[in-house]
Swiss-Prot record:
Function: Probably acts as a transcriptional activator. Binds to the GCC-box pathogenesis-related promoter element. May be involved in the regulation of gene expression by stress factors and by components of stress signal transduction pathways.
GO cellular component: nucleus
Cell compartment(s), UniProt: Nucleus
SUPFAM superfamilies: DNA-binding domain
Protein's name according to its UniProt entry: AP2-like ethylene-responsive transcription factor At2g41710
Positions of the DNA-binding region: 70-136
Region Disordered: start-end pairs: 1-28
Gene Ontology BP term (one): ethylene-activated signaling pathway
Length: 428
């Protein structure tokens, strides 16, 4: 306390002695305050004992929040806490972002080392043994031989199945390449109805799920499954046993079905492509024998042809065809008759009589005989033709008038108030 009081009295005495030194004392007080703040921050940092990166590295592996990893190409998800492996492919063009390169997602893993090894295998497949990876290349000698015969997509799909026995725990952004495989790479045949389900079979770490799905497609001979529950048309002469039958009889039926399928598969030639066995369908020789033994068997087409609806349809079609044929015959006969008439008789042109109303009573009629036009065509056209009154020119009308008619008659035109025209002869 004495030291504090003595230090406090020092500035006061200096301030009192120096009358004009108030500005210098305020600067020293501000500097001392900054020094105290710096010492407090430094002391708090020493008490923490480590930086932010060191504290993140000391976090337990089960807690989420650590996003970095010590391995190349591996990050930790912020919320799930799983390790995700990514690969940056620079050889492709990203159309969505319009730039070169895209990120290849290799899956999410519970183990950090498994994610790192998945990245190593993908990098070796993309860029070869000379690329930078997390572990030595000698650890992947066997994998380098296997990846030579696979494409990039196929090898990336195989990484999620058995990468060193550590499969991916989650792959929500990918789909299976083979039919019948889900995201967990379990082969199933759920489309086939029945009490039993094929996906109840458990697989080992080294089993190939895709080939197992192909084996299921060949009726799964070694699985002891009663196929008669799925195939209703199993056989023509086989009687289905009730569900209350004993287990021994069911096993016997399964074995019989298996032996029948095996015999059908062995009869096929090795050079021919594989075909599914036609269960319940007879071969060519058996079909002929059955036709000989049962000649009265009728097909679906024969039954349909004997139905009344089919017969009525046939009658309608026949009636329509007959009516069309009759119409065609009548038209042909008419054409023949018309052609004969045209060839036997000369075509006579009708003579049209033209008349002009003259006062409603008298009319100037023309004879019905045809007048030749030779005199009109050969005569010179030296006339006083008027477009308003063409009747005033006698030369134009001379060839058309009969020999007994007078040429001095004139016709006058009068216009009425109703805008109708009437022609009146000149009074004599």
């Amino acid at each position: 306390m004495a030291s504090v009081s003595s230090s406090d009295q020092g500035p006061k005495t200096e301030a009192g002695c120096s009358g004009g030194g108030g500005g210098e004392s305020s600067e020293t007080v501000a500097a001392s305050d900054q020094m105290l703040l710096y010492r407090g921050f430094k002391k708090a940092k020493k008490e923490r004992g480590c930086t932010a990166k060191e504290r993140i590295s000391k976090m337990p592996p089960c807690t989420a929040g650590k996003r970095s990893s010590i391995y190349r190409g591996v990050t930790r998800h912020r919320w799930t806490g799983r390790y995700e492996a990514h690969l940056w492919d620079k050889s492709t063009w990203n159309q969505n972002q319009n730039k070169k390169g895209k990120q290849v997602y290799l899956g999410a893993y519970d183990d950090e080392e498994a994610a790192a090894r998945a990245y190593d295998l993908a990098a070796l497949k993309y860029w070869g043994p000379g690329t930078l990876i997390n572990f030595p290349v000698t650890d992947y000698t066997r994998d380098l031989e296997e990846m030579q015969n696979l494409s990039r997509e196929e090898y990336l799909a195989s990484l999620r199945r058995y990468p060193f026995g550590r499969k991916s725990s989650g792959f929500s952004r990918g789909i299976a390449k083979y039919r019948g495989l889900q995201s967990r790479w379990d082969a199933s045949a759920s489309r086939m109805p029945g009490p039993e389900y094929f996906s109840n079979i458990h697989y080992g770490a080294g089993d190939d799920r895709g080939t197992e799905g192909d084996f299921l497609g060949s009726f799964c001979l070694e699985r002891k499954i009663d196929l008669t529950g799925y195939i209703k048309w199993w056989g023509a002469n086989k009687n289905r046993q009730p569900e209350s039958s004993s287990k021994a009889s069911e096993d016997a039926n399964v074995e019989d079905a298996g032996t029948e399928l095996k015999t059908l598969e062995h009869t096929s030639h090795a050079t021919e492509p594989y075909k599914a066995p036609n269960l319940g369908v007879l071969c060519g020789t058996q079909r002929k024998e059955k036709e000989i033994s049962s000649p009265s068997s009728s097909s679906a087409l024969s039954i349909l042809s004997q139905s009344p609806a089919f017969k009525s349809l046939e009658e309608k079609v026949l009636k329509i065809q007959e009516s069309c044929n009759n119409e065609n015959d009548e038209n042909a006969n008419r054409n023949i008759i018309n052609m004969e008439k045209n060839n036997g008789k000369a075509i006579e042109k009708p003579v049209v009589s033209h008349g002009v109303a003259l006062g409603g009573a008298a009319a100037l009629s023309l004879q019905k005989s045809m007048y030749p036009l030779t005199s009109l065509l050969t005569a010179p056209l030296l006339t006083n033709y008027n477009t308003l009154d063409p009747l005033a020119d006698p030369i134009l009308w001379t060839p058309f008038l009969p020999s007994g008619s007078s040429l001095t008659s004139e016709v006058t035109k009068t216009e009425t108030s109703c805008s109708t025209y009437s022609y009146l002869p000149q009074e004599k």
